[in-house]
Amino acid sequence: NELTYRAYPYLKSRLLHHKLEFFGYDPKRKELYVFNLDTNGKIVGFQTRELESTGGPKYKTWNLERIYDRLKIPHNLSDEDLTAINKISMLFGILRVDMGRDFTIFEGPIDAMFMNNSIGLTGVKKKITDFDEIPTARYLLDNDSEGKNKMIEKIKKGQKVFMWDSFLRQYGLTGKRIKDLNDLIKYEYKNRTGCLENLDQYFSNDPKDMIFL
């Protein structure tokens, strides 16, 4: 694919080379584009990632309003509709997910590509309240202090979160460099432990299970 060939080694290193429809590449800026697609494959938002450091932010997220402004295309939307669409365009996979069954919320779009029926956020620094009233929502945020603190907030409210510590101990992975689902997928690709088959067993909404996060 001529739009992604320069970024192919990076995508392959993260086992994303079979999902090229979600990516583009800007050879001038040396930026990878991660697309938020609807069910028809139309772009409703995107995130860029620097493949060569320039000293600026590694990730930049573009909502639909910003895209239209850059292209100088009038959107002809009311302020209310524009606010709603901008919100949707920052939730990767939101237009492809079935909330009638369990769906998983990740910190970013890359991890969400490795699990069916998932949504990718654009980080967890802001409050995540959009899914608080949806009983089928569950959180698999990063295995770091920021992600775990956010999941502690959620499990205290009775929402399902992934118990990283319990999972990693069970499969002898404590001490491995596994920060997120993509890291886990890469580890499993090399080592074939079978651990991915049992991920569902390590979600809990019991506040007493906070010690296993």
Predicted feature descriptions by range:
Residues N1-V44, Y68, H75, D79-D81, ...:
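TOPRIM metal-binding catalytic domain and adjacent DNA-binding surface shared by DnaG-type primases
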Residues E2, Y10, K28, E50, ...:
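Broad hydrophobic/π-residue packing in well-ordered secondary structure
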Residues T39, V44, G100-F103, P109-L213:
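TOPRIM fold recognition
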